[in-house]
Amino acid sequence: MTAARGVDAIIHAAALVSLWQPSPAIFDEINIGGLESALDVARTSGIRRVVYTSSFLALPPAGATTALRANDYQRTKVRAREVAQAAAARGEPVVILVPGVLYGPGPPNEANLVGRLIDDHRRGHLPGIVGSDRCWSYAHVDDVADAHVAAIVRPLAATEYVLGGENAPQMRIFEIWRDLTGTPLPRRIPFAAASAMGWLEECRATMTRRPPIITRGAVKIFRHDWTLNSSRSVEELSYRIRPLESGVKTLFSTR
């Protein structure tokens, strides 16, 4: 409560982004419980606005009407979005932002999937790409950050805004990287082989408590297209959709 004293708005962007954890409950504690705690603070502190950062994985895949729950990260992000929507429906000052695949300068970790894949490929540690022809929506982190600021300061007509980017096949990232660096394209891994690898990696992780390289849940996600429409955000938040090629060049300048 002390931290919220004199605060006008809260951005709740914290999340556990991970393929796997030894205890699935940690996803619930952070991804759902963290949001519930932020909402509790807002209710008791007179916060004017709460901006909650969701994920494109909390939305249904392209062409579907139901969200997936392929792994514990996705399951808890779907549930957290429902919690935020319920709060907004009760009249609480909640705005939900739904970024696409975030990329840009930063450490190559699980929250920066594009940076991690490129870094692994550059160092020869990437076995290949699963679902290379599936289209995802790539949102540059700087543009998403600007949208968060706009969501705090602007009067808004809606309670949820999608922050997608250029919709492109996964392999397009590596084609741009090849053109910049001369690095060959990665191999394409069939879904069946990736699922088998995921099962083996899950078994290894259970025995060693070390994170798997891939999981069957991740393969389920990679089977789908995740294209996004950000027109409302462009109009009401002045959201910028950066061309993927110019965005990937910002990665090149930091590697």
Predicted regions and their residues:
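Short-chain dehydrogenase/reductase
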Residues: 26-32, 69-81, 111-115, 134-138
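Mid/C-terminal beta-alpha module of Rossmann-like enzyme folds, strongest
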Residues: 147-213, 230, 243-252
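Conserved Rossmann-fold NAD(P)-dependent oxidoreductase catalytic core, especially the SDR/UDP-sugar
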Residues: 33-76, 95
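Conserved beta-loop-beta element that borders a ligand/cofactor-binding pocket
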Residues: 82-105
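NAD(P)H-binding glycine-rich loop region in Rossmannoid oxidoreductase-like domains
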Residues: 1-33, 41, 61-63
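Glycine-rich Rossmann NAD(P)(H)-binding loop
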Residues: 104, 130-134, 161-168, 178-181, ...
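Conserved catalytic-site region of short-chain dehydrogenase/reductase
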Residues: 19, 55-63, 102-106, 111
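A conserved pocket-lining segment of Rossmann-fold NAD(P)-dependent short-chain dehydrogenase/reductase
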Residues: 117-139, 143
